Amino acid sequence: MVVLTGHTLTLEEVKRVLYRDELVIASKESMEAVERSRKAVEEIVANKNVVYGINTGFGKFSDVLIAAGDVEELQWNLIHSHACGVGEPFPEEVSRAMLLLRANALLKGYSGVRPIVIERLLDLLNAKIHPVIPQQGSLGASGDLAPLSHLALALLGEGEVFYRGKRVPAIEALSAEGIAPITLKAKEGLALINGTQAMTAMGVVVYLEAEQLAYESEAIAAMTIEGLRGIIDAFDEHVHLVRGYRQQVEVAARIRDYLAGSKLTTRQGELRVQDAYSLRCIPQVHGASWQVLDYVKEKLEIEINAATDNPLIFEGGAKVISGGNFHGQPIAFAMDFMKIAIAELANISERRIERLVNPQLNDLPPFLSPAPGLQSGAMIMQYTAASLVSENKTFAHPASVDSIPSSANQEDHVSMGTIASRHAYAILQNTRRVLAIELICAMQAVEYRGVENMAPKTRKLYEAVRNIVPSITKDRIFSKDIEATAQWLKGVDWPFFLQTITPTNQYS
């Protein structure tokens, strides 16, 4: 069970909720803070104090005073008018993360919602009712207005949701679970949609999956080293300690661990003096990507516990301040940085694929073909990898350097953070497929070398994937193999699978 406080949520807890469907509840203390904040809003309405978003219009309409009798209609209008998202929906795990993160943000007690609003968010989460939320339409300031409006619709029993494997009207799923829709009161519509939870939710999913893929990329690279009879000396601890980057040292340690006991690796001067960079510099390149992952993790763990609403209510209502915590610039920067880190794992992987299939660079059959000439073998797999890598370079263009004014220039600088997160997710999918191709090629290469000569850990990886992708004995439709391998990489419980050495403070 994960207990939300608004302050202590971790990425490990988010992972358990997203991928293991762990039950989520709100702490008693946080709900008490929510109640105090709500009383402040009700007093503002009763006393007819003018406060943005409670009894005024929104954006450029912030100077329009709303009559007391129209305050609830204001919130209803807000959600419906702002539900302007278009395009394909976010993956279900992202929608699920948005429910979790919005509930956690509201539990900080600075937003002025009733406890029932948070309870409904958690009801949907625990019942696995995931709002259908279009991916396109957010500028990343004033928060993720359009995506979160589609989330809010589900609380009202409107819009569509994913439920039990189907896309159905929200009211149908709520009725099936005995969950009553809510009616929004003063400020609650704004509190639901004024935040960074779309970009952050997708960012969290990208981080969690990229972390696993980074580990996997090292084991795949280790098998490639075996397939190419690579030189193990380049991974000696002394080399990496003198540079001083913890992540680089740890990657080298994991490569040594994966290759322990291998009869396929070589020593300096045995076959050649040194390897190409795509083999020799694995710790330096992969380690640099880990540095970015660590940076992104730090930013995400702040943002998943952040108050990103506007206005914010302090000191029991004594202070109600309009600020800009909804601005997604920190996450936009983090996701743009993440795009580069993930893309680079694909870049170096594609170069290793080339070394596996190019007969001018190895002593293996051309393109790993069982009958070169008659059969093309892995030739076009390298084309696919090159295409995916090239597409990644387009996606890696920073979204955060762009800004288009909106709301009649009231919102004159925006983050485009959700675009950055979406592109990071696209790069992640491409990179996983590139690594799947490398794994397929590496498995074929070690077969030519003799599987019995592999290290125990790389052989375990080989045997697991051979259960879903057979050896290349003749040409076939390799697209299915690539997708099956990519799905396996996404779904396997990696640290336990190969007892991967995880980061420590040994080299801090």
From Swiss-Prot:
NCBIfam families (alphabetical): hutH, PRK09367.1
Pathway note: Amino-acid degradation; L-histidine degradation into L-glutamate; N-formimidoyl-L-glutamate from L-histidine: step 1/3
Alphabetized PROSITE patterns for the sequence: PAL_HISTIDASE
SUPFAM superfamilies for this protein: L-aspartase-like
Name of encoding gene: hutH
Main location: cytoplasm
Keywords tagged on the record: Cytoplasm, Histidine metabolism, Lyase
UniProt similarity note: Belongs to the PAL/histidase family.
Name of the molecule in the record: Histidine ammonia-lyase
Protein's UniProt keywords contain Coiled coil: no
Enzyme Commission no: 4.3.1.3
PTM comment: Contains an active site 4-methylidene-imidazol-5-one (MIO), which is formed autocatalytically by cyclization and dehydration of residues Ala-Ser-Gly.
